[in-house]
Amino acid sequence: MKKIIALILSALLVCSAASCSGGNSSSKAESKTEAATEQKTEAPTNDPEIQAALDKMAEDYEFEGVVYAVKDGTQVASYAKGKLENGDEITLESPMPVGSVSKQFCAAAVLLLQEQGKLSVDDTLDKYFSEYKNGKKITIKNLLSMRSGIPEMTEEGNENLVSNDKTEKENVDAIKKWVFSQELDHDPDTIFAYANVNYFLLSNIVEQVSGEKYVDFLRKSFFTPLNMNHTGTIGELPSNPDWAKGLDYKKVDTQPGLTNGCGDIISNTHDMTVWINALSSGKAISKDSYKAMTTDYSPETHYGYGMFLDISGGVGHYGSIGIYSAFDYINEEKKFTLFVDSNTLEQPTEINSVVDELLKALMK
């Protein structure tokens, strides 16, 4: 899906530079993404040139899902096509899983706790996992930047590590037991190695430090204050499916607890646009914390804390889980944000293509 996302981004950025500097008075009125913004049911008028570029890209790639682009606080392009698992039409308000885009929320939660003086990214893991033999070697910062050396928990051979027949706690305990028994793949802070296990452990640290369930801390700290009323976690679907009507829990293809911190968020275009603006503007976390998120700790791959940093002049993250693929993007220089989600692009390479092309068009 990366290729598709690239197409979307290139299309939008090219057109925005060419046609949006003066703006469109009819499209400016209703698309500010302040923290107190309420869910809108009527979409503002899109910029004709940018919308045309997006529509062409979507047609060429037979893209199904949602795209939402905002420049200078104004919606400039939107797209919604396809069906949810229950047959309902996909709309801009349809919540869908965002996969690894979830890592931004986990990184922000850790940094917020640091702002509150409750932890430090320089803490070593033995402070939180006394049973971990390598705990003294690895810091929270190593987890955030994917430089811990901890082997991936979902590697081949671990298919029976977790199960839908087990509770979330049982699965979490099983994963931790396995992780803490393994040797490191490499010394900490020597190599970037993308692994979900890093953010899985971070979510557990958030729970320990806050004294709350991870999702409860996210809701209290981010979702509720930012009026992200269509955002929650995969684990909430079986007991509270109404807020994400149309989603099939089985299509997410995960077991309770497995995605904690690393791929557990479900959201929609409005909430994700609010989120990425709040994240970069100092509303969700401090400016200093956001700077830490977007600092390059791995020049070979350009990764910060839950953010890839070298995407057409901006930052963002790709996500893929089950049948869903997503992408969010922030370009502070051009004051442009983008969110893409699909329930038909099962391979990450597909959404990458969409984003690459859309960004090219927007950047012209």
Listing of model-derived features with the role each one plays in the protein:
Residues 138-322, 326-327:
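Short, surface-exposed loop or secondary-structure junction motifs
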Residues 22-24, 28, 36, 40-80, ...:
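Catalytic loop of the DD-peptidase/beta-lactamase superfamily, centered on the K-T-G motif
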Residues 46, 50, 98, 102, ...:
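Hydrophobic (often cysteine-bearing) scaffold residues that line and stabilize catalytic clefts
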Residues 1-4, 8:
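Positively charged n-region of N-terminal signal peptides that target proteins for export
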